[in-house]
Amino acid sequence: MEKGITKPSILVVADDFTGANDAGVSLAQVGHTVDVAFEMPYRGDASVWVINSDSRAMDPKLAAMKITSLMSNLPLANNPPLVIKKIDSTLRGNIGAEIEALMKACGITGAVVAPAFPQAGRTTVAGECWVNGVRITETEFASDPKTPVLSARIADIIRLQTAIPCQPVTVSQLSHLSYEQPWIGVIDAQTDSDLDRIAAAVMQAKQPLLLVGSAGICDAVARRSAIMPPPTVLAIIGSMSGNRSTADRHTSFTPTYHTDIRRC
């Protein structure tokens, strides 16, 4: 690292603006200092760096080149922090190409892919992506005009853009996998608890692993690395709309009836 630059404890590389901010918010809410960067070279002292590559809709080769270029400005390869590749939970984008480029740039030989986001209805079952109980190839995401999803099998999608071996794995297998040759493992997850176990296994691994996932895995890392509990939020919401005032007047003139259900 250059003199005067503090190495982050977590580095997130997202492929779009929304994903970058999602990841940053999750980690900021539990006490991390977070910087979201959109241009290189970037230098900062936050504990979490979130880099937006804005490469989701790019040609795969150009997306890989963008990742390589971004990482060349971040001197982390010799001793990388926890590195998260933030992807879309519905598998849109250049997942395989960007995973390979990031692994090479960070000197990491293993990647764990867990794109599930249970809170949004996105789960991984038997290596396939499901959305609200429907296989993703049977949803509107299959016909996305920019980045259509061609298969429900996550490993198949990744293999379209990389020659690195990719296959389903389990959390228990992570501690036994070889680090001599590059590999990519896809892990099932249907609940936040599943993602918590995946995040814990990656963060405790004997050698650095690339953690690949959506907002769900970023939330799991936030829970695992929390510096302080999320703050209580009070929202006070008002409206200057004339329609709101009219509705309030109607409500004030409308009789209110109370029924004691204990007598029913």
Predicted regions and their residues:
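Short gly/pro/ser/thr-enriched loop/turn and capping motifs at secondary-structure boundaries
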Residues: 41-43, 118-122, 217-220, 242-243
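Acidic, glycine-rich loop-and-beta core segments that form the ion-binding/anion-interacting portion
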Residues: 209-256, 260-264
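Residues that scaffold, gate, or flank divalent-cation-dependent active/transport sites
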Residues: 24-32, 40
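Structural motif
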Residues: 11-13, 48-52, 112-114, 184-188, ...
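Soluble secreted/lumenal catalytic domains
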Residues: 31, 206-208
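Short glycine/serine/threonine-rich phosphate/pyrophosphate-binding segments
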Residues: 19-23, 94-95, 195, 220
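Cap/lid and interdomain-hinge subdomains that line or gate substrate/regulatory clefts
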Residues: 2-9, 34-37, 47, 63, ...
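Short, structured active-site "lid" loops
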Residues: 50-67
